[in-house]
Amino acid sequence: MSYPTLRLHPRKEESVLRFHPWIFSGAIATFSAPVEDGDLVSVVDSKGRPLGTGYFGGGSIAVRLLSFDAEEIIDRAFYKRRLEAALRLRLSCNLIRPVDSSDSPNTTYRLVHGEGDSLPGLIIDIYDRTAVVQAHSLGMHQVRQTIAEVLWEVFAEAGDPVLPLEGVYYKSETTLPTRDMRELTSDGFLIGHTEAAPIYENGVRFTPDWLKGQKTGFFIDQRDNRALVAHYAKGRTVLNAFCYTGGFSIYALHAGAKRVDSLDSSAKAMYLTEQHVALNFGADCPRHHSVTEDAFDYLERMPEGEYDLIILDPPAFAKHRKVLRNALIGYRKINSIAFKKVAPGGIVFTFSCSQAVSKEEFRLAVFTAAAASGRKVRILHQLTQPVDHPINIYHPEGEYLKGLVLYVE
């Protein structure tokens, strides 16, 4: 099958030859025919040598390459191969553990993580028997029904421990790159139907909200880091700032924390947290307290030594590099307060989910905050996203989640 051909300027093929899946608009010299957003295109170098095939987009990232094999046809069979490969990876990591598993059950995971699974522009999260599909490009939006059908087929054929799907929900109203694109779609089930129901994450229960929740309904990317919080939480007094659904709080309570305070400015977030506390511990859990307040204000006014484990997991302070300076100021500020206020011998978990902030920039912001506190601070762990959010080694931009665990004397 032939697609319109996009020819690059001289020497602009170097990143593609290193298997980077993005081609920027400034690298393009000519088109063999008119193309529109979402069209499949063949990419060649300045001498006409084939480089691969991908979806065209009108933004600064002009092409997201699906294949570096110019002969590979992008069809239903292509998507099935990619989804089967993604599922094999999750199975090889022992991520899929049903409720009757002798190990702690885990029925939620990310099946497709964009470039990390060689499907740029596509996210698929699994919540028990529900798959939530999210497109970040018009090309993926246009094949959403094909993806849903192939996904249904792959899960039906997989066998234990993979559960056949009962619903594939499409959630892209807020993720397509332009307003015009977003107006082309509405969220809803592509196949089947399910109702929100509790899932298991490492034996801990949560109820994702794919209808109204952020991302696809739950923050799966912090699973491993929540488990690490549990490792340190026993007997401690914990503050979970920017708690959203309360994931860190629930793990800390399960681990035997003396007290956990969940902090968020959103009343809806506090409702979700309290629902998850009740799901795991019943309607009355005297070790848990909810605080609905701006996190910066609360951190400023809380007494020194009140907590000996503080978790800082704010929303993205910078979605693009233009606001990077303000983001770094924000990271320095919250970490500086935490370092000053945490009890001696306390632990601080601090995170950035901003792709625009590099690992080095985040670490420098935390270092600056530590220096300003005047306390002795040591790094215990350097954190990132879990194995079901794989990072394509040729696409370092895929490493968006950064975290540090720090011991403060």
Predicted regions and their residues:
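Non-catalytic substrate-recognition/targeting regions of SAM-dependent transferases
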Residues: 112-125, 141-219
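C-terminal catalytic and target-recognition region of SAM-dependent MTase-like enzymes
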Residues: 306, 333, 347-409
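Conserved SAM-binding motif I beta-strand of class I
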Residues: 259-264
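S-adenosyl-L-methionine
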Residues: 268-311
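Conserved SAM-binding loop of SAM-dependent methyltransferases across substrates and taxa
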Residues: 245-258
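Conserved class I S-adenosyl-L-methionine
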Residues: 235-244
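Non-catalytic accessory regions of SAM-dependent methyltransferases
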Residues: 1-122, 126-128
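Mobile active-site "lid"/loop adjacent to the S-adenosyl-L-methionine
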Residues: 292, 308-337
